Amino acid sequence: MSFDWLNVPGLDLSSGDQAEKRPSNGLGPPSVSFDFGINTAAPHDSSFWDQGSRSHSDTTLSYRNNHSNTAADNATNVSSPQKDNPPNGEVRTLSGGDVYAESPEDMQVPLSLSQNQLTHEEIRTYLRWYHYICLRTHGKLVRLNDVFRFLTNFNLSQKVKDRIVEIFRSCKNALNIGQFFAVLRLVSRAIIYGILPLRRMILEKAPVPKPRPILSSENHEEVYEEVEDDDSSAKTGDQKVDFDSFASLLLTGKTTRKRVRRRIKNLNFKSKKVRFSEHITFQDPPNLNQESSNNSEARKQDPDAEDEDQDSNNDSPLDFTLPMDQLLKRLYKRRKNSGLVSSLPSEQQETEEEKKVLEDMKDSLSHFKQIQTVDSASLPISSVFLQNGNTLPTSNVNNTTVPQQLPLEPLKPTATGSANHLVREEYNQGLHPSNGAIQTGLQPLKPTATGSANYLMRSHMEQPQSIKPSSTPETVTNSGGLQPLKPTATGSANYLMKQHISPSVNNPVSSMFQAQFTNQSSSPQSTGPAFLNSPNITLPQSNQQQPYQEVNPTQAKIEPSNISPQHTYSNNVRINNGNIVSMPKVEITGAFPPQNTLPQHQQSHLLSPQNTIPQHQRSQLISPQNTFTQNQPILSPQHTYSNNQATMISPQNTYTNNQQQPQHLPPPPPPRAQQQQQGAIVPPQHMYSNVQKQNNLVPTQPSYTNSPSIQSPNFLSPQNAANSYFQSLLSSSPSPNPTPSNASTVNGNNASNGISSFQNTSAAMNNTQSHQTYIQQQQQQQTQQRIYGGQLSQMQQHPGQLHLNNSDIHSQPNKPNYGMLGQQVHQQQQQQQQQFPFTADVNRSNSSDILGNLQSLQQQVDALQIQYNRRP
């Protein structure tokens, strides 16, 4: 087909002829020239076609460049993989001078991508980035400038940005999400492969670009590389210690000849090293006074130079960063404002007026030096003067004051608990008022008791007993030594009072004991201290007995009529015809236990009403008031005998009283046994005659109301205090048997047994009994072991019995006046022995004690047999 009919005569067809000569080049169809005199050799301006105003459909309407192959070769970039001109392509000249040409294949590639055309990594990353840009722009359509701003950290070159703008010129101001995916694909290919993107690259998959790490160095100043060590240096032994190779040797067991070395590429960073000079120079600080003097001398020598210097200083501005003294000197040198600084601060002299004023105020200037602070207010005046740095003037023979330095005193401890240390110091000063020696040495801190005042009272009550005229200097000299810390009891004051009153066992009863006894026997509250004052029983009254003082209010009403000189006596201190006498010839092998911390079943047998005693057991406490008030409104022998006859305590009633004991007692016998018990009771006259016949039947051991817990005097000894106390704790366990319902009704009957707790209810010890009787008694005791096993085992833990001499009871000077009351008391003793016989300790080392134990055991066996009618 020929296009010659289009040729119009008269027109310049040179361009067309040239185009016809090149049909074989394959640059396009035959040229149809619409040239109207435009110079085609001139470079085409980018403003010839309004690229921004064209839409996506206008891409086919492009200006065709029909130039030679040289112009077509310039359309492609040097870095582009395709070096041939695309057939039927589009050639564009960018503003940077590069020519961009789009082939028909490029024109067929869409500028948008769907999610199906992306990889999973691209979808996940590009969607996140798109949402980030939308959040910043507050819209769903983004611009290319927003994308480039978001990709600032990727360091895109300007050529890449221009090429992408040229490709997406139709939608550069409004990119949807598909076009955004296409833009990022071209950006990733340009960043990773370092080429200018083309339109056809949109369909090619590309990895996701990763930004430059923040911590990475721009120029890679430091590079760590492995360097092999030289064998020659290793052989010489001059190499440094390589901790990395040593660590690898410990971990892997192999030695490595490589080490990591840091190599700095940038020369600027190589020079930055800290170097220490081996030569250290010292320079004295400048002396300002010397400089000023030198300057003044120089100015005197050269006054013209001084004026010039002043002029230069006046003209130059002040440097306010100078130190204050130099700045003041500069201001003084200027002398422009005389009111600001008249003279140098160091050169100001005191005037005569100022000197006179200071002389007048000299006395008042030292007023505030003697003010006592909070710390010095509690110190004596001498220490205050020492603290303020002054010395005390002391006058000597010539009346001249010589300063004397007093030694510093150590800090004294402050008692945070009770006032033990304070009272102890005051008490010691009262005991030793004439101690002229002043202890100036450092004293150790003394312990302060945070509990009760046991240690305090113990130390103060022991001091009067140990003070002797000859021992005064010894106490003074020993007080300066280091004393070990002494324990302080945090419980009750029982152990304290026991230790202080127990040394008075062998002393006669003093008037103080008489006064305490008479005052305390008139009220039920003071029954405990009455037994404290006895020579043998030194249990104190507990501080916790106050809640139980009102247990028996009826006793307090009847008690004033019950006081009788024949019957108000304690265990070892008795009132005989109005006189208080002690039991004669009572030997104590040990003192009494340290504390009254026995269980509840044992506290009913103590000699002072303690805190854990029920009401039905309190009637058996060892107090004359509790003994006689309920059973004896009037103390007469006939009335006492009738009362005791009516209130004979059966084993059942006794078992009621002992319901708190840990030992398992036998169950109460049937009522028929009680009737047999009444028939088997020996009359008081017969019992009293038996007591008269037996010389060694002496009330030696107190009957603590059917309790086997306290059977020996060693139980109350301070030497065995800890052992006895812990044994009593270990042996105590609550009784599984409940309290019978008739416990309250037996209270009156139990009170009659309280008299026996006053007396010494150990049975008569016959010294003439043989060893065969002891063997028989042991056999019988084994039969009773299951019944009274707990009692016998605990009794054997406390060796020792109280004995009197074998002399006749009538031959003793302090024989108690029994009468009918004595018969009654011994009858109750016999009855209580029948119910709960007390065993003696078999573990006594002395032979006499063993013999006494044999006799007591035999007597108990006889009492048991009489009780159960096994022997006529």
From Swiss-Prot:
The modification Phosphothreonine is found at residues 416, 450, 490. GO terms for biological process: cortical actin cytoskeleton organization; endocytosis; positive regulation of clathrin-dependent endocytosis; protein secretion. Keywords: Endocytosis, Membrane, Phosphoprotein, Protein transport, Repeat, Transport. It comes from the Eukaryota. The modification Phosphoserine is found at residue 564. Sequence repeats lie at residues 405-424, 439-458, 479-498, 534-545, 564-575, 593-604, 608-619, 623-634, 636-647, 650-661, 683-694, 717-728. Residues 405-448 are annotated as: 3 X 20 AA approximate repeats. Phosphorylation by PRK1 and/or AKL1 on Thr-416, Thr-450 and Thr-490 of repeats 1-1, 1-2 and/or 1-3 negatively regulates SCD5 function in endocytosis and actin cytoskeleton organization. Residues 651-663, 728-745, 823-835 have a biased composition (Low complexity). It is a peripheral membrane protein. It is found in: Membrane. One of its GO terms (molecular function) is protein phosphatase 1 binding. Residues 48-85, 284-296, 339-348, 462-481, 594-620, 697-727, 746-758, 806-815 have a biased composition (Polar residues). Residues 534-728 are annotated as: 9 X 12 AA approximate repeats. GO terms for cellular component: actin cortical patch; membrane; nucleus. Residues 1-98, 209-239, 280-321, 338-358, 460-489, 516-571, 591-620, 649-681, 697-758, 806-838 are annotated as: Disordered. Regulates both fluid phase and receptor-mediated endocytosis. Involved in vesicular transport at a late stage of the secretory pathway. Regulates actin cytoskeleton organization. Interacts (via KKVRF motif) with phosphatase GLC7. This is Protein SCD5.
